[in-house]
Amino acid sequence: MATQRASGLLQRLAQGSLVKQILVGLVLGILLAWVSKPAAEAVGLLGTLFVGALKAVAPILVLMLVMASIANHQHGQKTNIRPILFLYLLGTFSAALAAVVFSFAFPSTLHLSSSAQDIVPPSGIVEVLRGLLISMVSNPIDALLNANYIGILVWAVGLGFALRHGNETTKNLVNDMSNAVTFMVKLVIRFAPVGIFGLVSSTLATTGFSTLWGYAHLLVVLIGCMLLVALVVNPLLVFWKIRRNPYPLVFACLRESGVYAFFTRSSAANIPVNMALCEKLNLDRDTYSVSIPLGATINMAGAAITITVLTLAAVHTLGVPVDLPTALLLSVVASLCACGASGVAGGSLLLIPLACNMFGIPNDIAMQVVAVGFIIGVLQDSCETALNSSTDVLFTAAACQAEDERLANNALRS
């Protein structure tokens, strides 16, 4: 009987809301650090194990996800929705640029266990590009062992294109391997509440409660940047497309898609909601049936913001100088990373080390930044998903309405 009760409890924990569990871990970590500093430092091992698990799974995750995505891509899909795809990519890049501006206007700092003396910063854009080129030609095994994400990305893209010409059995095997790695990532993520409990406890016990203000500032910068993109940048892109007041459409998408996505924290889970909204807006079914699932995969403005802001927070913390060309290159890298962040809980956080590599930041420190992301992830991930998913409908509607108006004008002229 006791065994059955224990099994039932574990099942409820495994199937329970991860957001609520992380909140509980966060609160318990704060309480433990306040009540007993030695105990809080002792449970820091839980946080160390969690970060170690993330470090172990992240390189193979990037390799398999990107390789499977390219290998299983359907030929000709892009041509049907070219204007929407362009808006997706432009919106993601614009979000990354906005995040760079926000990060320099309101610089955030993190509490990391390494000092600036451990970092050899690049002297400028030329050295950054040189480092990127050297990283690209790394041995694949060496890239995986040393978490060289640039090298991993190059090999994943190359193998993905090569496997496009393979038979279906091979593609299915790659897809199954990708699903298996994704399952392992989800398993690690399920331990996030325990890891956050250990990280928060040990961090507060070591650095004091002033650390909380640093996280609050970082969260304000992240959410503020997402609001800027949702209420200023995206409406400008929509206005450029439809040439009329974009805000009725913007608010409709935020209200009927963003709110659902905020609580589900999954662009994939929000696809049926977005499909229903597209039907309500009388959009072309052949278009949105392709663009909405595609948007859930590559339209990741929120992820681009998260990657950029957290990377620059680490850069500011370590005192690494950043010039304008390097910041622009970071926007491009963050946009590319964001497009590969779909389908994984915390996917944008796990791609932060790739952006950190640009500035010579070691993987150990980059994973501490990822851990900070998980601490603030209760709100960050919800806001990120709300922005991502609502933008899928917004850009689809903008492109469809612009095309309808073009056809109507052509009909009038003829």
Swiss-Prot record:
Sequence intervals crossing the membrane: 16-36, 46-66, 84-104, 143-163, 180-200, 219-239, 300-320, 332-352
Q: Kindly give the Gene3D superfamilies that the UniProt entry links to this protein.
A: Sodium:dicarboxylate symporter
Family membership: Belongs to the dicarboxylate/amino acid:cation symporter (DAACS) (TC 2.A.23) family.
Q: Tell me the Pfam families matching this sequence.
A: SDF
* Superkingdom, taxonomy of origin: Bacteria
Give the way it sits in the membrane. Multi-pass membrane protein
Q: Does the keyword Cell membrane apply?
A: yes
What's the main place this protein lives? membrane
A molecular-function term among this protein's GO annotations: neutral L-amino acid:sodium symporter activity
Gene that encodes it: sstT
Q: What is this protein called?
A: Serine/threonine transporter SstT
What are the UniProt keywords, alphabetically?
A: Amino-acid transport, Cell inner membrane, Cell membrane, Membrane, Symport, Transmembrane, Transmembrane helix, Transport
Q: Which GO terms describe its biological process?
A: serine transport; threonine transport
**Which reaction(s) are listed as its catalytic activity?**
L-serine(in) + Na(+)(in) = L-serine(out) + Na(+)(out); L-threonine(in) + Na(+)(in) = L-threonine(out) + Na(+)(out)
Q: Which GO terms describe its cellular component?
A: plasma membrane
Quote the InterPro entries the UniProt record gives: Na-dicarboxylate_symporter, Na:dicarbo_symporter_sf, Ser_Thr_transp_SstT
What is the role of this chain? Involved in the import of serine and threonine into the cell, with the concomitant import of sodium (symport system).
Keyword Transport tagged: yes
